[in-house]
């Protein structure tokens, strides 16, 4: 029995979010939330909300025991980029890409 939660177009670079996602992949759900709670990275707060949502989905929709859940898969995919313009010297301009991420968390029973 698995439950899934998805956060789409989170305003964080996928490269930065994957650093945090790699830390919690495979951990028990309770341990993952505790680890994310005390991390000072922006991605940790976003991923913590998605993990808690997946845990709530498993508990409410499928009646799973929260103590037996673990983070089975966590994926951080690239979302649409916001294109911005920054003025530079001598009338030039450069393009800035504000990257977004799609964060997917699947929790399931630890066997």
Swiss-Prot record:
UniProt-listed GO biological process terms: translation
A Pfam family annotated for this UniProt entry: Ribosomal_L22
Segments traversing the membrane: none
InterPro entries with a match to the protein in the record: Ribosomal_uL22, Ribosomal_uL22_bac/chlpt-type, Ribosomal_uL22_bac/org-type, Ribosomal_uL22_CS, Ribosomal_uL22_sf
One of the record's GO cellular component terms: cytosolic large ribosomal subunit
Recorded coiled-coil stretches: none
Keywords: Ribonucleoprotein, Ribosomal protein, RNA-binding, rRNA-binding
Record-level Gene Ontology MF annotations: rRNA binding; structural constituent of ribosome
Domain of life from the UniProt record: Bacteria
Function: This protein binds specifically to 23S rRNA; its binding is stimulated by other ribosomal proteins, e.g. L4, L17, and L20. It is important during the early stages of 50S assembly. It makes multiple contacts with different domains of the 23S rRNA in the assembled 50S subunit and ribosome.
HAMAP family xrefs: Ribosomal_uL22_B
Family according to the record: Belongs to the universal ribosomal protein uL22 family.
Subunit field text: Part of the 50S ribosomal subunit.
Protein name as catalogued: Large ribosomal subunit protein uL22
Species name: Xanthomonas euvesicatoria pv. vesicatoria (strain 85-10) (Xanthomonas campestris pv. vesicatoria)
